[in-house]
């Protein structure tokens, strides 16, 4: 079976849920459209929207530390500026282009702050051309990288550990079928075609504790980074 793309996903807000995409237009140096365009900065984070600089992911709310974020279903409509958040029995939809809308979003997410920051508010932040990818701290080019996931490799790990692994744990933009398992480890500095778009393998994704979180239960149930080390070596 020839390799093919079977899933396209963007994550409008860093650390929050995925939005499936039927198709996307990729352009050199611009990353995956609409991906990680927003983030929830911690109360002590001095991120400046007028002069954005890439910061470590620990400066923002993230699944690696706040696994409860996985219970949220979010959607962003660029045309209206509306960010919708569903948390089990309660929901919120606000226009984040307005100060009041952002203030309400900030207040909603206050409960997800770590204990040492309780009583304060996170800030929903964004900046034109800025992407809140984890690897953005390494270079401007990596800030706009597109993340790809080989589903054959995911199944290989599943078989070895005897547990189901939802591919959404890995928060990739592009899901690919039809490849040999772990062939992606050979893609560094190689040209890769996504449809008519030529990409180049930049680096292997270093998996963090966010992958430990089950997207269905919002609990940590598998030490994925450790299992990957065992499977790959």
Predicted regions and their residues:
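Metal-cofactor-dependent catalytic cores
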Residues: 1-233
């Amino acid at each position: 079976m020839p390799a093919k793309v079977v899933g396209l996903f963007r994550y409008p807000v860093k650390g929050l849920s995925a939005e499936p995409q039927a198709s996307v237009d990729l352009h050199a140096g611009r990353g995956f459209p609409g991906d990680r365009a927003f983030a929830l900065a911690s109360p002590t984070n001095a991120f400046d929207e007028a002069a954005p600089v890439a910061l470590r992911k620990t400066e923002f709310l993230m699944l690696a530390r706040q696994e409860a974020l996985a219970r949220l279903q979010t959607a962003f409509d660029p045309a209206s500026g509306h960010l919708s958040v569903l948390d089990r029995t309660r929901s919120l939809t606000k226009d984040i282009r307005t100060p009041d809308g952002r203030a309400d979003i900030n207040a909603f997410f206050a409960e997800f702050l770590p204990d040492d920051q309780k009583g304060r508010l996170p800030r929903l932040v964004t900046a034109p051309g800025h992407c809140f990818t984890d690897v953005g701290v390494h270079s401007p080019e990596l800030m706009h990288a597109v993340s790809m996931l080989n589903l054959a490799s995911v199944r290989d790990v599943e078989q070895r550990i005897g547990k189901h692994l939802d591919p959404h744990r890995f928060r990739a933009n592009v899901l690919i079928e039809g490849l040999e398992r772990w062939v992606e480890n050979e893609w560094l500095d190689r040209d890769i075609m996504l449809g008519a778009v030529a990409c180049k393998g930049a680096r292997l994704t270093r998996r963090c504790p966010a992958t430990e979180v089950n997207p269905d239960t919002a609990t940590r149930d598998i030490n994925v980074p450790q299992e990957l080390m065992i499977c790959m070596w």
